[in-house]
Every structure is written in C-alpha cells, then in structure tokens.
Amino acid sequence: MAELATIARPYAEALFKASGSDLGAAAAWLDELAAIAANVQLQQFAGNPGVTVTQTFDVISGVAKSQLPDAAKNFLRTVIENGRISVLPEIAAQFRVLKNAQSGSSDATVYSAFPLEGPALADLAATLEKRFGRKLNFAVELEPALIGGVRVVVGDEVLDTSVKARLEQMKVALIS
C-alpha cells in the first residue's frame, strides 16, 4: 500500500499544481477515471503486451460517461504510457487530500441503515460539521446491518451512533 502511495504522490501533486483554480472539475474527471481504472478486466487489458497505449486510451475514454477535457486526456495518456493504470484510484485519493487541505475541508462517509435525503441529511451535515470543526464533503452509503443510526468516517476518525454499535457495547458489558 505504501508503494502505491509513493508512486501516486508525484502524479497527484503535478495534477494539483496544473489544475490551478479548476480543482473541482479535475477532481470530478479524476474520480471517474479512477473508477474505470479500478476494473480488474481493464487492468488485465491494459497489462496485455499486445495492447497499445492508444487502444487502452480509446477504451477508457470510450467508457467515460462524460467528455474528457484536454487536461484529462493528456493526464490519462501520461498515466497509460508509464504503465500506471492500476495506480489511478490512489492518485485520485491523494488528489482529494491535497484539494481538501487547500479548502480546509475533509471527506466524510456516512453509513446509514436507511436512505438519507433532503432535510435529514442537511441537519446531519450541520451537526457533523459542528462536531468535527470543519467543512465536510459527504458521501452516503447504505448499510442495513447497522439496524438504525449512522456511522460516520472522517479521515481516521469514526463516530458510530448505530444501534448495532450500541448492541455490541451492551454485549461486551454483559459478558465482562
């Protein structure tokens, strides 16, 4: 894992510097490319010695949902030419860290037993931003095993207010 981070860091830093004031757009297309590159079949295709850089580029850009800007195309070609397709997800993660550091925000993943939308999500967001003391970029994922409540992951901090966590605490207390 540390090796991937070491390989990805220069790419993420170069893209961060080159993106300038357009960090949001760069993050969007980089996340899309990272999701595509995470596909095992694509990695096998790209790793095939009989497949050219152009063929790999055409497949990835063809799968992309949106039209890639020139900066994205150039970045993708560079990554493919250097044989770093498998590192794209880590590049995207490190780019987000740099982007968040500049804006003073953090990524937060909210795991919930039930869908969170509208006012409920806005209330939760306001409460969590107050709790963590910074602006949070939310991603909500359903996890029915929580039974109720939410589990929030912000960097290396976890706030677990789920029913499942409370039941586990009660179990530990009763067994002790």
Swiss-Prot record:
GO MF annotation terms: proton-transporting ATP synthase activity, rotational mechanism
Instruction: Identify the GO cellular component terms for this protein.
Output: plasma membrane; proton-transporting ATP synthase complex
Give the matching Gene3D superfamilies: N-terminal domain of the delta subunit of the F1F0-ATP synthase
Grouped into one coarse class, the protein's main location is membrane
Q: Where is this protein found?
A: Cell inner membrane
Reply yes or no: does the keyword Protease apply: no
Q: Membrane topology per the record? A: Peripheral membrane protein
Q: Pfam families, alphabetically?
A: OSCP
Q: Which UniProt keywords apply?
A: ATP synthesis, Cell inner membrane, Cell membrane, CF(1), Hydrogen ion transport, Ion transport, Membrane, Transport
Assembly and binders: F-type ATPases have 2 components, F(1) - the catalytic core - and F(0) - the membrane proton channel. F(1) has five subunits: alpha(3), beta(3), gamma(1), delta(1), epsilon(1). F(0) has three main subunits: a(1), b(2) and c(10-14). The alpha and beta chains form an alternating ring which encloses part of the gamma chain. F(1) is attached to F(0) by a central stalk formed by the gamma and epsilon chains, while a peripheral stalk is formed by the delta and b chains.
Among NCBIfam families, the record links this protein to: ATP_synt_delta (TIGR01145), PRK05758.2-2 (NF004402)
Q: What does this protein do?
A: F(1)F(0) ATP synthase produces ATP from ADP in the presence of a proton or sodium gradient. F-type ATPases consist of two structural domains, F(1) containing the extramembraneous catalytic core and F(0) containing the membrane proton channel, linked together by a central stalk and a peripheral stalk. During catalysis, ATP synthesis in the catalytic domain of F(1) is coupled via a rotary mechanism of the central stalk subunits to proton translocation.
Q: Which PANTHER family match?
A: ATP SYNTHASE DELTA CHAIN
The similarity comment for this entry is: Belongs to the ATPase delta chain family.
Q: What is this protein called?
A: ATP synthase subunit delta
* Species of the source: Polaromonas sp. (strain JS666 / ATCC BAA-500)
What does the record give as the organism's lineage? Bacteria, Pseudomonadati, Pseudomonadota, Betaproteobacteria, Burkholderiales
